[in-house]
A protein has these predicted regions:
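Active-site groove signature of glycoside hydrolases
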Residues: 130-146
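N-terminal binding-site loop/beta-alpha segment at the start of enzyme catalytic domains
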Residues: 2-104
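Beta/alpha (TIM)-barrel catalytic core signal, keyed to glycine-rich beta->alpha loops juxtaposed to Asp/Glu
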Residues: 142-305
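Acidic (Asp/Glu)-rich catalytic clusters
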Residues: 38-41, 94-102, 125-132, 156-158, ...
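Conserved, mostly hydrophobic/aromatic
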Residues: 37, 49, 81, 94, ...
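Short, acidic/polar
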Residues: 60-73, 115-130, 174-181
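Acidic-and-aromatic substrate-binding clefts and catalytic sites of carbohydrate-active enzymes
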Residues: 56-58, 84-92, 112-118, 142-148, ...
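Short, well-ordered coil/turn segments that N-cap beta-strands
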Residues: 44-46, 77-79, 102-104, 134-137, ...
């Protein structure tokens, strides 16, 4: 019988309630770990949230559901929220739903060509996501669009205190060679890349380059748009999951990513509060070492590169 993620979570929740009734602590402990931004030492919670597709909404009922997603993220100690003007209404939705506290760590992107066009787009994005104003946390160059132009603006803005950090992003591994050169020569504060059990090319050179250059790494598409979860949902959770304090496949996939020391924060996207509550549990408890990570890859891919 194939179980949906909702059904799997229901079984896990029932088991968790039983453990609590017996007085045993839940696996993972409940306190989200943090990792430092290498350039400054500022600590970031290790599970954040993306907004591609999920926050591009208009209806009141949809927004209330997303408000609960944010509540689950913050309740667990998460703070990182990533968006882009490419994502439709997502930036505006985030700005509308955020309350006065806790203070999030907000990231968005510039996704246009030209200095003046980039400045106008970034100002609009910052106002949409954080109407309260003040220094914006992280501005990234989306998919390296006109990056040489925007790097100059972002450095000026960082020096002026308009933004706190700047970075680069791309959604395909085909851009990793260029990103590696930018990391080495331009020294961004952040990169955002795809990295997962199924997409591991970043391990070859880009992640080591980020570690050497003291660049923080945000990981997009940790579930490969859900395909990795669909591939495993029919399988029972393996007994070894308990060795890294996991109660779901989603947690295993996220902890596999966090097992790489160069990774700062995966940013799974969801519009389902139950899925967010599940994902954030990967932010606490034991992480897999390198041997355990190889075991996970072998389990899920048959050992294929």
């Amino acid at each position: 019988m194939t179980m949906s993620r909702r059904e799997v979570l229901g079984v896990a929740a029932a088991a968790l309630l039983a453990r609590r009734a017996r007085g045993a602590p839940p696996p993972g402990g409940g306190t989200m770990r943090t990792r430092p931004i290498p350039r400054t030492g500022e600590e970031l919670p290790v599970i954040g949230m993306g907004t591609w597709r999920t926050f591009d909404v208009e209806g009141a009922s949809e927004k209330e559901r997303l408000r609960e997603v944010l509540r689950r993220l913050f309740e667990a100690g998460g703070r990182v929220i990533d968006s882009s003007p490419m994502y439709g209404r997502a930036e505006q939705t985030v700005g509308e739903l955020l309350g006065p506290s806790p203070r999030p760590f907000l990231a968005t992107k510039v996704w246009t060509s030209g200095r003046d066009e980039g400045i106008a787009q970034m100002r609009r994005s910052m106002k949409l996501m954080w109407p309260k104003g003040g220094a914006f946390d992280l501005m990234q160059i989306h998919n390296l669009v006109d990056w040489r132009t925007h790097v100059r603006t972002l450095r000026e803005w960082k020096d002026a205190g308009t933004i706190r950090y700047w970075g680069i992003t791309h959604y395909t591994s085909g851009a990793f060679d260029e990103m590696e050169q930018i990391v080495k020569k331009e020294k961004p504060d952040f990169v955002q890349i795809p990295y997962s059990v199924g997409v591991r090319e970043a391990e070859d050179r880009l992640l080591p380059a980020c570690a050497d250059a003291r660049v923080a790494v945000l990981v997009e598409r940790p579930f490969e748009a859900g395909s990795l979860l669909r591939d495993v949902m029919h399988r029972p959770l393996p007994s070894w999951a308990a060795e890294i304090d996991c109660t779901s496949w989603a947690q295993i996939l996220l902890k596999w990513i966090l097992g790489h020391p160069a990774v700062t924060c995966p940013i799974p996207a969801t519009s389902n509060p139950e899925h967010m509550a599940d994902d954030v549990r990967a932010g606490s408890g034991r992480l897999p070492d390198e041997a355990f990570r190889r075991r996970i890859v072998a389990e899920l891919t048959g050992g294929n590169r």
